[in-house]
Amino acid sequence: MRVTNQTLWVWRAARTVAALGIALVLAGCSSVKPWINEPLPPEDQSIPVRKSQRDPSILVAVTLSGGGARAAAFGFGVLTEMQETRFVWNGSPTTLLDATDVISGVSGGSIVAAYFAAHGIDGLPRFEHEFLRQNFQNSLITQALRPGNLIDLTSPWLGRTHLLARRLDELYGGLTFGDVERRPRHPQLFITATDMSLGTGFEFTWEQFSLICSDLRKVPLSFAVASSSAVPLLLSPMTLKNYADQCPERRSTSAASARAATGDYRARLYRAHELSYTDAQRKPYIHLVDGGLADNLGVQRLLDRALAGGGLRQTFSEVGIPPRTIRKLVLITVNAERDPSVDINQSDKVPNMVQVVDALLFGTGARATRETQEFLRDITRQWQQSLTAGSPGSTDVFAPDAEIHVIPVNLRDAPDDIARRRLLQVPTAFSITSEEVTDLVEAGGSVLRHSPEFRALVQSLLNTAPHAPPAGLQAKD
């Protein structure tokens, strides 16, 4: 069945290419230009200080990996389970999802991350109907075959991923990052693509866009998600203009930045990549492709930023969190990576193009993910040791009883062996079957519930609650 579906997809893609060739002959070359990012106005060229409406004593961040609709469904299941996790914090009933202050997404994970940031908890159930249960991929192909779009594709400034962005714009209702900022109690949204020239992550954040002197508020969610989902060869890169020469020279004078210049190599590399964006003459444009090529977990840039900022304490203190405030820091990393479709080591035949792309994305990519996960484990131990040792200063943002909970949620940890093997072979596509959606949503909730780290968090929340929390907090069997 999988071969049949893949063959059908390739046939449709070939039909699209053939139709495009006819359009080229009939229409010549189109001059249409797609949306392009805007520069920051002169009066608004400083990074805004974000004021969260959530209780800063508990900070929750969620990262959703790439993997097409498979990752979106698995991540949706995790978010749904987080909403089911109810507890009382500082005398007020809440849920783990409502306490989430940061959501980060890559590729397929960015589709659901952006939807949640835009529509919140009340709008999240609609995502299942509007994306997961729809044949999004077929509608994308149908849209690509429309004569107007075929002619647009003859433009040297417009590629296949722009058609994906148009379809995603319908899903998000034309919303921009500025619209997300105006929604009450919105989480910070991080979407990661890959800078083709650097091979590193490019985040759609205020910090990143300030480097190129561009206004993130005007960026459509659809553009960011399409950039993060632009698988090389199958889809085209997306382009941003660098306006760094229109902003005052950005100088970093903090002691943390000075330490980063001579400290950990990851911090030095992070700062060097930052600096490369400030030269608009050498780098007037940035071309973006699938974020999974640089960081399929969507967590590496968060860690590198903390290192470059001088460490966890310094990073949080610089965003204005008062001393001795943070009691719980929770990071949930969701990984929906699958196995390669074919084990190329089992044959002496030359792998075909589909197998090569598959192996590069899910073989090499899996190795990079394992390295990131190991780095996360190491840095988590360092954070725990730092908390245990305490801070001699009176400006420490962590309370004396502060705890850090890092919770990995991997599709490979699905409890049922048969279901796990089947789900790990679900293709990376914009649409999967309704049965696969149901199983992946259930798997997301199940893996989170059975996670030892999650159970430890639940128990900790029970112990720190001022009075008995609602029954929904109890860890489910």
Show where each model-derived region lies.
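Catalytic domains of lipid- and phosphate-ester/thioester hydrolases
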Residues: R2-R12, G28-D477
